[in-house]
Amino acid sequence: MADMNQHPTVFQKAANQLDLRSSLSQDVHARYGGVQPAIYQRHFAYGNYSNAGLQRGQATQDLSLITSNASPVFVQAPQEKGFAAFATDFLMGGVSAAVSKTAAAPIERVKLLIQNQDEMLKAGRLSEPYKGIGECFGRTIKEEGFGSLWRGNTANVIRYFPTQALNFAFKDYFKRLFNFKKDRDGYWKWFAGNLASGGAAGASSLFFVYSLDYARTRLANDRKASKKGGERQFNGLVDVYKKTLKSDGIAGLYRGFNISCVGIIVYRGLYFGMYDSLKPVLLTGNLQDSFFASFGLGWLITNGAGLASYPIDTVRRRMMMTSGEAVKYKSSLDAFSQIVKNEGPKSLFKGAGANILRAVAGAGVLAGYDKLQVLVLGKKFGSGGA
C-alpha cells in the first residue's frame, strides 16, 4: 500500500480518467479502516465494517467496516493543502457522509435487526424471527412507524467526524513505522507491513469511536417489545451510555472490541490478497485499461472480502447485544462456538444480503451528491463513508 503512488493501479488510471472515487463497505472499512486503491477510497457507503469502511470510502472507508461493514475517506492533511481547504473538505465530507448514511439508514437498520435477531429473541424483545429483508421492513414500519427505520442513524453520522480526525492523526505515523516497499523489500514484507500499518491505524481509531458504534448497534436493535409492554430499552444515545455504564461499566461499551481489531486485519488481508491475485489474471489485454472491468473487479473483491469476514462482524455485534443482559459470552471464541452450535453456521451470515444491497443505495446517493456539488458549488469535495 505504501508504494501504490509509485506504481499506479488500473483503479487509479480509471479514477483519473473519470474522476470517480468510490467507497464500498461502510461498515466494512469503518469497521475495518485502511487505504484501498484510489477508486475505492470513497466507498459507496454501505457499511462496517466498515463496513470497510469500505469506508475507507475511506477505503476508510472507517468498508466500514463496509460496513462497515462495516468502513471514511482520506482527504489531504492540513499541512499538505492549507487549513482552510482542509476544513472545507472535512466539513463537506461530513455533509456527504451524513447524506449517504441517512439515505442508507433504513437498509442498515434492517441489516442489524436481521443480524442480531437471535439475541433479541433470547432477551424477549422479538416475538418471532424475521423471514427476510422485505418482511423485516414491513414489520418494522407496521409496529414502530416509518421513522423508526432511521433509529441509530444519529450516532452513525456523528461517528464520521472523530473517525476522520483520528485517521489524519494516525495514518501518517503508522505509514512511516511500516514503510516497506514492494519493489525494494519484496511482496510478503510489503504485504505484512500493509496489514500491520492498516490494522494498527484502524485499531487506534476504533478505540476512540467504538462506543459510538456500540451505541448505534444497540439503538438500531432496540425495537418496541410487545412482551415488555411495548417499551424500548433505551430512550436515546445518551441513555445508552448511562444504562450501559451503570450495568456493565466501561467494559460494556467495549464488548466485542478485540474481535473487531482482528476483523480489520482479516478484511485487509483478504482484500489485498484477492486484489493482487486476481488483477493480473483477469485484467489482461483489452480489459487492462477498462474502467468497467476495473470497477467490476473492485466491487467483486470488496464484497468478497466483506462477505468472507462477515462472521466476525456478526460475532462482535452479538457480543455488543449482551451488555446489560444477565448472560454474556465469555469471549469472542465462546460467542462463535455457541452461535454455530445452537443456531448453525448460517446464522453467522444473517443480514449479509441487506449489507450488499446497502452498497447500491450508497453508490447512487454519493454519485448524485457529487453531481449536485459540482452544479451548485463548482467542484466536488471529499466525502465519507463508514
Swiss-Prot record:
GO terms for cellular component: mitochondrial inner membrane. It is a multi-pass membrane protein. Signal peptide: none annotated. Its main location: mitochondrion. One of its GO terms (biological process) is mitochondrial ATP transmembrane transport. The keyword Membrane applies. The chain crosses the membrane at residues 86-113, 154-178, 187-207, 257-278, 292-312, 352-372. It catalyses: ADP(in) + ATP(out) = ADP(out) + ATP(in). PROSITE patterns: SOLCAR. Keywords: Antiport, Membrane, Mitochondrion, Mitochondrion inner membrane, Repeat, Transit peptide, Transmembrane, Transmembrane helix, Transport. A motif (Nucleotide carrier signature motif) lies at residues 316-321. GO terms for molecular function: ATP:ADP antiporter activity. It is found in: Mitochondrion inner membrane. Residues 316-321 are annotated as: Important for transport activity. Solcar repeats lie at residues 84-177, 189-281, 289-375. ADP binds at R159, K171, R316. Residues 1-77 form a transit peptide. The matrix-open state (m-state) is inhibited by the membrane-permeable bongkrekic acid (BKA). The cytoplasmic-open state (c-state) is inhibited by the membrane-impermeable toxic inhibitor carboxyatractyloside (CATR). ADP:ATP antiporter that mediates import of ADP into the mitochondrial matrix for ATP synthesis, and export of ATP out to fuel the cell. Cycles between the cytoplasmic-open state (c-state) and the matrix-open state (m-state): operates by the alternating access mechanism with a single substrate-binding site intermittently exposed to either the cytosolic (c-state) or matrix (m-state) side of the inner mitochondrial membrane. Belongs to the mitochondrial carrier (TC 2.A.29) family. Monomer. This is ADP,ATP carrier protein, mitochondrial. The lineage of its organism: Eukaryota, Viridiplantae, Streptophyta, Embryophyta, Tracheophyta.
